[in-house]
UniProtKB/Swiss-Prot annotation:
It is found in: Cytoplasm. This is Poly(rC)-binding protein 3. One of its GO terms (cellular component) is cytoplasm. It holds the Pfam family KH_1. The keyword Cytoplasm applies. InterPro entries: KH_dom, KH_dom_type_1, KH_dom_type_1_sf. Widely expressed, with highest levels in testis and fat tissues and lowest in heart. Keywords: Cytoplasm, DNA-binding, Repeat, Ribonucleoprotein, RNA-binding. The gene is Pcbp3.
Length: 371
């Protein structure tokens, strides 16, 4: 998260039937919500997010950005692509429903063209389907699947597209991937039906958006645990650093959570005494240097602040102890639906505190979702 980022908790739309979409407020699912009056009622505007690999993104952008420019101009939709240092990228499409569907059609037909071109140099005789991956708040996936899978079965049968909702949430988010495969026409019809479901069943609670991780990530230590930095987040590192973790634990044993120890501020473990640890890290200096303290602010909806604080402050104290950061939660302000959290410490402390706060929010929001 950047400075002052807010985690958005959408208001709940009144339930309506499929024939009354024109009466919905302008809805950016996965974004913000605004209401614009137009002739004949309220105009529906959507924001839909797609997850793409680098090669797919390159196809969408085209030479010198010509392809994406053409898509923007001809569809009337806003098409934004996330930063390029990740193997996966988020493509965000925003606009009135007609513009959204035009943009989807252009993307689907472009991918089909890529498949046909790749087959000209391949012995394969059967053309593989076009595949797109949507990113959808987990709390909406239950409505998309339907009771006993009835809704998703209906969408498959009526459009001819294959639709799969991932069982697990995307890392460090409250969103799931929805994979759509088929002909471009089938995909377009499928996306239209999914949009109807999204409008009918807005997200419940706060949505923590998925942010793809960079291809290579530095490593920090805090609380005796190895973490990788992914953008603004500290994520528990995978098994390949188990050996390094064990080395660090041997050098600086940490007490169980809740026991006091003057050596436990949650700071990085001193690795300079272990040559083997340095070699594993791929760098020989700088890990034990203490960077200057900095401050990061974020806002949390009032209805979620309790899960961060915990009973008698137990959860926030755990987060402080594990991260080594100073964390202050502002008092509730009259008329405001949010509380400000100020995190102070080294960049490593702040990243770890953010990760732990997001983990608490993910747990709470997942419990809210009617999946």
């Amino acid at each position: 998260m950047g400075e002052g980022d807010a985690i958005w908790a959408p208001p709940i739309l009144p339930h309506s039937t499929l024939g009354t979409l024109s009466h919905h407020p302008e809805l950016h699912f996965g974004g913000k919500m605004e209401s614009k009056v137009s002739e004949g009622g309220l105009n529906v505007t959507l924001t839909i997010r797609l997850l793409m690999h680098g090669k797919e993104v390159g196809s969408i952008i085209g030479k010198k950005g010509e392809t994406v420019k053409k898509m923007r101009e001809e569809s009337g939709a806003r098409i934004n692509i996330s930063e390029g240092n990740c193997p996966e990228r988020i493509v965000t499409i925003t606009g009135p429903t007609d513009a959204i569907f035009k943009a989807f059609a252009m993307i689907a037909y472009k991918f089909e063209e890529d498949i046909i071109n790749s087959m000209s140099n391949s012995p394969a005789t059967s053309k593989p389907p076009v595949t797109l991956r949507l990113v959808v708040p987990a709390s909406q996936c239950g409505s998309l699947i339907g009771k006993g899978g009835s809704k998703i079965k209906e969408i498959r049968e009526s459009t001819g597209a294959q639709v799969q909702v991932a069982g697990d949430m995307l890392p460090n988010s409250t969103e799931r991937a929805v994979t759509i495969s088929g002909t471009p026409d089938a995909i377009i019809q499928c996306v239209k039906q999914i949009c109807v479901v999204m409008l009918e069943s807005p997200p419940k609670g706060a949505t923590i958006p998925y942010r793809p991780k960079p291809a290579s990530t530095p490593v920090i230590f805090a609380g005796g645990q190895a973490y990788t930095i992914q953008g603004q987040y500290a994520i528990p590192h995978p098994d390949q650093l188990t050996k390094l973790h064990q080395l660090a634990m041997q050098q600086t044993p940490f007490p169980p959570l809740g026991q006091t120890n003057p050596a436990f501020p949650g700071e990085k473990l001193p690795l300079h005494s272990s040559e083997e640890a340095q070699n594993l890290m791929g760098q020989s200096s700088g890990l034990d240097a203490s960077p200057p303290a900095s401050t990061h602010e974020l806002t949390i909806p009032n209805d979620l602040i309790g899960c961060i604080i915990g009973r008698q402050g137990t959860k926030i104290n755990e987060i402080r102890q594990m991260s080594g950061a100073q964390i202050k939660i502002a008092n509730a302000t009259e008329g405001s639906s949010e509380r400000q959290i100020t995190i102070t410490g080294t960049p490593a402390n702040i990243s770890l505190a953010q990760y732990l706060i997001n983990a608490r929010l993910t747990s709470e929001v997942t419990g809210m979702g009617a999946l």
